[in-house]
Regions:
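Short, structured active-site "lid" loops
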Residues: 28-50
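Short amphipathic alpha-helical segments
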Residues: 1-3, 56-60, 100
Length: 126
């Protein structure tokens, strides 16, 4: 994913992890989410085995709307309707080609800006 983002000409901040050893993914999910919440990064992408734990960790940070996506339609809809600012994926769930398609869809889809969706986002953030 990192190489794919760089090929797209995007600047990447890698918050880890840097090995294939078992790690405490909440540390990395929180670091990525904090970078987005602080405005250091526009969007964030986090990955763990299922994507579940790291998405939960990211969503603990105020202002983060991290969506776990295993298909491109979910990635599109979470941007259109939820204005998600982070994407979580499971490395053990989606293959490389699908993951890259999900990433592209997530990054290339803009928030619809519809009042009903913004109203719901406001309710979530209360």
């Amino acid at each position: 994913v990192k190489a794919h983002l760089q090929k797209r000409g995007l600047e990447v901040k890698d918050c880890g992890c840097y090995s294939t050893e078992s790690c405490d993914y909440p540390v990395f999910g929180h670091a990525a989410a904090q970078a987005v919440a602080d405005g250091e990064c526009e969007k964030g992408i986090v990955i763990c085995t299922t994507g579940i734990g790291i998405s939960i960790s990211a969503n603990k940070v105020k202002g983060i709307r991290c969506a776990l996506c295993s298909d491109s339609l979910s990635a599109k809809m979470t941007r259109l309707h939820n204005n998600a600012n982070m994407l979580a994926m499971g490395a053990g769930i989606v293959g490389t080609n699908l993951a890259l398609d999900i990433v592209d869809t997530f990054l290339d889809t803009e928030f619809s800006g519809e009042e009903r969706h913004q109203r719901r986002i406001n309710l979530i953030e209360q």
